[in-house]
Every structure is written in C-alpha cells, then in structure tokens.
C-alpha cells in the first residue's frame, strides 16, 4: 500500500500510535508487518525506491514462509514510502537499517547516519525512537545525545532483533523481547509497544545492556561453530572423520553442545564479533576469544579453496559448480550477503584463474547469484554437467536431497564432489570411477558407507 492511502495528517494524528519503520530489509519489514497485524498503523520507509515500489505492488522477495500471507491477510496493512513522513504523522520510529562492517572491521555507519540525519528533520519532543539494528555497545546512547542536541527531549530505547533469517516473522512473535531505555519512561513505552506482539518482555537496566545481549547471543554461536570448524580442520590434517568424532562424543553424553561443522556466513554472524569488539575498545577490553572464533570461521572458505585447487590444479579449464549460494539453507533464505559461496568463488578464482564457475540455488535470485561471479543455472543438473568440481555449499533440503550418484554420471573426468556440510557423507563409496568424494572434516576420504 502506498502512503497516499493514509489520508490527511489530521486523521493520522487521531490514531493512538503511528509507527514508522525505517529500513525494510529482513529485519524491518517483518516487524512492520507484525505491528500492522496487531492493529497499529505502520509506515514502512526505505531509501531503495525499487524495493518500495515492489512492496507497494505486492512483490516480496524475502524468503519467509509466513510473511507474504501475513501482508495480504492483515486488515490494516502497512503503507510503504521512500521518504520519511511529515513531522507529526508518526510518534514512534524504529531504526532497522543495515549496519555492516567496513574493510577495517569497524561499523560502516553510513546507513545509520543517513537515517538519523533524516529523522532529525521529522522528530518532535516526546517522540520515541527504537534502535532495532545491531550496533556496538554505546551507539544508541550516542545517537540519543545527538538527537537531543538537535531536537530536544526524545525518548530512546534499544530493542534488538534476535530472530533467525528465514523465519523472522514467526520468531518476533514468540521470542522474548529485550528492552532497554535511556530513561524509565522510554523503556516503559517501548515495552508497552512490543507487548502488543504477545511476547515476554525482558526489561534490562539500560540501552547498553540491550546492545550487549544481542551481540553476545551471536558471538556465542560464532564461538561454538568455530570450535566445531577447528576440529574439522584438525580432522582434515590427521586423517579423521569429524562427523564420526563429534557424533561419537555426543552419543549419550549430556554435556555435549557442539554443533556440526560447516560454513558460518550471512550478514549477522560475520560482523557481530567485530561490532562487539568495537564497543568494548573504549573500555580497554579486547574480546580475544570472539575475534579468534571469527578468524577460524572466516578461514573455512580458504581451507576449502586450497584443498579444491590442489585437486583441480592439473586441469586446463576446470568447471566448478557451486550448489547452494545463499548463506544457509535451513531455514531457507534467499540472502547471499556474506555467504561462503561468494567468498569461495573469490578465493578459488584467485587460485584457479582459468576456471569457469557455475552457480545454482533453489531460492536465491539469479541476478544475486550472478553478482557473486557465477554463471547462474536454473537447475542443479544444468550446473553440474561436465563439471570437474561440485561444491555443496549450503544445507538447503533441495541440496542435501540431490541424487549424487545420478549427478556424478554427468560430470567431467576427473571430478570431485566437495561437501562442506556433511550432507552427502558416505556417498563417495558408491560413485563411479573417476569421481572423488571429499568432505570438510573428512579430506582423508569416505570413512563409512552408511549414507546413500
């Protein structure tokens, strides 16, 4: 819906609360729809005019199983615009803009700064601004001080998003919501707002605590994945099978928490350790474990690329097919930002400059696949025909369910299937001659003929 459907400013002023969600990506759009479904009037704003036009015309590219149906079935649908509403049309603003890191692994605050600069021209004393974006500790208060100097008394709260990409709309309506404010009034207003979603409110003592809660949640996941991935690299060097090691240690043992090894990508986990470190630096603290874990996980692509390049080095023009371009497959997502596939393409391209790269993903858009340097293919079969290397790069069910033996029959010779997730573990024992199967954490070869 376009914002022209809202009616006059006077009519909007009569509404109890009008929310303006700034940023309509994987965080902002589901939240805007959830609040609209709760009965609130919602204005969704994004500076990407094409995205706004797509939303107005019902074109939704988020891979979220509940989002599209929620938008169409919500009686009071959010309206969408490329510019902020006039002063007074909204009294609550939610910042959900992107907060990536730059080449120096520090916050790239361009989107946030632009949003704040625009907001200052719209805010009035007594408005409420909620930081939904993931930011370094101390950012929300710094933004609050900046706004106060320009506008006056504006309430600020930090209510971070902790949902999982691909299932955000459902999770924001069931996960406990962290709420921290710059004042008791700001916290109470933000808590009242999120209570409309029917979730438990976890009130914390200030905005810094709320920022920290979000960051350490992702950092602890990154650390656990890093331990599994370091074990996988150890197994590659010592001839062991990482899945056999981890599964055996897990069986019947109640204190085992290790996840399976595999790529760690996406727009959140790849940056949050750095944002965590940035917020702690003014206090003289360096989170060594968090930063080392990030280094380990970032090194998975390099580890895989070096192994693959050694296997394909003798080929004049190897064809490399990467299956699963999005940064993860479960829950499925179309997001390719910071995916292992993209980094693997860059590193293999440097090691095998003569290679041809094809890419296939069951949900990511072909233009997004092409933007990473792949020739996009419509089917997995089209991607692997005559290929010398096939990389299983995410764990989407459509990837893990592929008939590897049938696909292997279409490969060039010699060929290798390289599995980064353990999805086809054991399949190497049934492949035709000339086709090698290797897995991350199992470079020594197939340990057990127990899968397909």
Where are the predicted features?
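Structural/interface elements that position substrates and couple domains in central-metabolism enzymes
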Residues: 2-452
